[in-house]
């Protein structure tokens, strides 16, 4: 399946976990450029880097990216996507994939898979992917776990391992780890801004819980490729440098 979709790469400058990380040098290029180059292989009809910082915007323009400046007002990611869609003039039926600006090792095929997943499930309001991880990985609060029904629609997402093992009837050895790349129709992004807030979102700091709280449907498929290391903190930079070829 190769239908039209757009990509928005969010590159917010002063993130609490790692300020200025979009501009982190990886083999002579800012990290955001490596992310952009991964996105180009996905078959998307348009790629937009959304940032609240002129330094990031100028760097992105220098390597040929389309840039959309967003407001520096602490919006959540989904609301920022809606702001970009409004500024780009995209219609409600346009499919948009959000691609994190700190995921330079993500294969292009993953981006296309999540866009295809939304098109394959027209009753879904959002589509995403997951990978199976060990209990050791699932124990980390930085990884978001999810559970699905028998049609792979998301029932809940959490920073603690779910399902929690109590009964001996079934031994939980692996967990579904949420890959934070989603596909939406632009119309849903615009609706999201006006949905009632969710205390579940506030408690877990997972904005997709606001969708579930308001009766929206999220379909999750297992990723068809391994997902590389993300740059969550400064310590991750050297790990990523080892995995990215110097001439890339």
State each model region's role.
Residues 13, 71-77, 225-227:
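Short, acidic/turn-prone active-site loops that include or flank metal/cofactor-
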Residues 31-46, 58-63, 213-214:
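A short, N-terminal amphipathic alpha-helix
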Residues 173-248:
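Conserved alpha/beta core of the MobA/IspD/sugar-nucleotide pyrophosphorylase nucleotidyltransferase superfamily
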Residues 13, 52-54:
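Residues in the short beta-alpha loop(s) of Rossmann-like NAD(P)-binding domains
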Residues 108-196:
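Conserved core of the sugar-phosphate nucleotidyltransferase
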Residues 48, 55-116:
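Short phosphate-binding loop-to-helix
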Residues 4-9, 32, 46-47:
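Hydrophobic targeting segments
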Residues 1-19:
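N-terminal nucleotide-binding beta1-loop-alpha1 segment
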């Amino acid at each position: 399946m190769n239908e039209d979709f757009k990509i928005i790469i969010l590159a917010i400058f002063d993130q609490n976990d790692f300020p200025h990380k979009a501009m982190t040098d990886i083999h002579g290029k800012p990290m955001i450029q490596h992310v952009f180059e991964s996105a180009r292989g996905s078959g998307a009809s348009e790629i937009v880097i959304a940032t609240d910082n002129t330094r990031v915007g100028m760097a992105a323009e220098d390597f040929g990216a389309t840039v959309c400046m967003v407001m520096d007002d602490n919006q959540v990611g989904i609301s920022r996507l809606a702001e970009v869609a409004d500024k780009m003039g995209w219609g409600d039926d346009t499919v948009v994939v959000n691609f994190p600006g700190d995921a330079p090792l993500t294969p292009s095929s993953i981006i296309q898979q999540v866009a295809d997943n939304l098109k394959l499930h027209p009753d879904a309001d959002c589509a995403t992917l997951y990978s199976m991880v060990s209990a050791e990985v699932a124990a980390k609060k930085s990884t978001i776990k999810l559970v699905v029904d028998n049609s792979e629609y998301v029932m809940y997402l959490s920073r603690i391992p779910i399902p929690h093992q109590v009964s001996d009837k079934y031994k939980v050895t692996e967990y579904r780890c949420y890959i934070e790349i989603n596909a939406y129709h632009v119309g849903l992004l615009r609706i999201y801004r006006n949905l009632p807030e969710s205390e579940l979102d506030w408690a877990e700091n997972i904005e997709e819980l606001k969708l579930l709280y308001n009766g929206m449907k999220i379909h999750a498929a297992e990723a068809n490729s391994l997902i590389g290391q993300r740059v969550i903190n400064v310590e991750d930079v050297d790990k990523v440098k080892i995995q990215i070829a110097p001439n890339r």
